[in-house]
């Protein structure tokens, strides 16, 4: 009898341990966050999914369920750029249901407030910290290989399959892979990886419908070479300077022959001329010491995420990340994809929908370059250039191509949605529902 009780007790403990492990791996619901008054008015889940050999790489995510119809609304897998910028950047500054209150940091936990422009009003969003080393994602062993562009797709695809295995209620929801900035390089590779897996009958089958890219880095040469024409078009350099640059550099401002001293001198003059301009948003004032500045608002995330009470609330594994950094530029990374245009050509054939949008005051990845690589895909236009409106005002311009790609500018917008959050929310709401912009 004693042995039977012992074995029964052991079996119960073993099953309890399995349940606890599953709960930790599946993620847990967060009802309160430090800095926010009262319970959260939306459903937030955080957790880790192990990927790679022996699941040594633990990928951290924030999942916010759609506030409208989560059973049917699209599921967005969101990847922020950088590389190594936490997806919390998008959640808190660009398209999430909460944001930091614009006030001077006084040493206490920064305050959080609700937003009116959350994309989670029309979609469930899975914000992923990737690659490993980003945000709260970590590896149980020291990184054996330097992360790279070409190495992103496989672990993200593995993460998504495992997450959907644990959240089967979202398997039938339309899935879109979304992101901005540098994620424009890797998202097409991820879409291709997921698509190939579906063709190979990988389980679970993913209801992939397309992708969304905001101000996406795509082709190094095209993106960088478009900065000078953009600067001229925005009256940042003179006609004479621009014409001299075109003549001396012959349209190539990146890989300049060292013997072409005239071109190099003109490029130096260009850099000096725009040195006081923010590349991310050319209208952004130099206001480093004002609490409402973007730079100071961005610093609030690091104060907040490094609070012990915050990490406890988010269920971050203790001792895994010494210091949370919003964009961790200290980690080595191999940028081994110079152009993602070939991936776009491949996934265009598959017939996926896509939305590519550009803030028209972004000089980091100018809309001129984005238009250039889209033209290189050689698809006919099915809805030509026209304004799209918000409250009877022009919010930007748009056109749609035969490969189901919609391009849109955001008037007065910068490198990310945070500069025009209301307009980009209305844009994504219309596009996800299949309406014209």
UniProtKB/Swiss-Prot annotation:
Glycans are attached at residues 106, 378. Expressed in seedlings and siliques. It comes from the Eukaryota. Pfam families: Peptidase_S10. Residues 1-26 form the signal peptide. Keywords: Carboxypeptidase, Disulfide bond, Glycoprotein, Hydrolase, Protease, Secreted, Signal. SUPFAM superfamilies: alpha/beta-Hydrolases. Its main location: secreted. The active site is at 181, 362, 415. Disulfide bonds join 85-327, 249-263, 287-293. It is found in: Secreted. The keyword DNA repair does not apply. GO terms for cellular component: extracellular region. GO terms for molecular function: serine-type carboxypeptidase activity. Its EC number is 3.4.16.-. GO terms for biological process: proteolysis. Belongs to the peptidase S10 family. Probable carboxypeptidase. This is Serine carboxypeptidase-like 17. It comes from Arabidopsis thaliana (Mouse-ear cress). The lineage of its organism: Eukaryota, Viridiplantae, Streptophyta, Embryophyta, Tracheophyta. The gene is SCPL17.
């Amino acid at each position: 009898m004693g042995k039977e009780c012992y074995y029964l007790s052991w079996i119960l403990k073993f099953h309890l341990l399995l349940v606890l492990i599953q709960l930790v791996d599946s993620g847990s619901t967060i009802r309160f966050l430090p800095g926010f008054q009262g319970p959260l008015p939306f459903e937030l889940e955080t957790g880790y999914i192990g990927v790679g050999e022996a699941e040594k790489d633990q990928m951290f995510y924030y999942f916010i369920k759609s506030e409208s119809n989560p059973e049917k609304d699209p599921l967005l897998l969101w990847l922020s750029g950088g590389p190594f910028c936490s997806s919390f950047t998008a959640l808190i500054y660009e398209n999430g249901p909460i944001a930091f209150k614009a006030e001077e940091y006084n040493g206490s936990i920064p305050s959080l407030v609700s937003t009116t422009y959350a994309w989670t009003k029309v979609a469930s969003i899975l914000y992923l910290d990737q690659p490993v080393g980003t945000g709260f994602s970590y590896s149980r062993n020291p990184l054996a290989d330097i992360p790279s562009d070409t190495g992103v797709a496989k672990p993200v695809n593995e993460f998504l399959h495992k997450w959907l295995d644990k959240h089967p209620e979202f398997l039938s929801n339309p899935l879109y892979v979304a992101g901005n900035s540098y994620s424009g390089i890797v998202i097409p590779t991820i879409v291709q990886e997921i698509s190939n897996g579906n063709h190979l009958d990988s389980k679970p089958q993913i209801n992939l419908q397309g992708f969304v890219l905001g101000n996406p880095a795509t082709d190094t040469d095209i993106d960088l070479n478009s900065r000078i024409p953009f600067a001229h078009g925005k009256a940042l350099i003179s006609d004479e300077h621009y014409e001299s640059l075109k003549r001396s550099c012959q349209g190539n401002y990146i890989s300049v022959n060292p013997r072409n001293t005239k071109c190099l001198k003109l490029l130096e003059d260009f850099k000096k001329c725009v040195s006081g301009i923010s590349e991310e948003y050319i209208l952004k004032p130099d206001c480093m010491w004002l609490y409402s500045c973007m730079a100071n608002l961005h610093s609030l995330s690091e104060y907040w995420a490094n609070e012990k009470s915050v990490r406890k609330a988010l269920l971050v594994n203790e001792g895994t990340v010494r210091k949370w950094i919003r964009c961790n530029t200290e980690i080595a990374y191999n940028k081994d994809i110079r152009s993602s245009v070939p991936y776009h050509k491949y996934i265009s054939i598959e017939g996926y929908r896509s939305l590519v949008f550009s803030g028209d005051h972004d000089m980091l990845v100018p809309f001129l370059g984005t238009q250039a690589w889209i033209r290189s895909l050689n698809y006919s236009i099915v809805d030509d250039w026209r304004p799209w409106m918000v409250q009877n005002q022009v919010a930007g311009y748009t056109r749609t191509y035969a490969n189901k790609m919609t391009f849109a500018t955001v008037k007065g917008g910068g490198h990310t949605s945070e500069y025009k959050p209301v307009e980009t929310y209305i844009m994504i709401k219309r596009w996800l529902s299949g309406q014209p912009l």
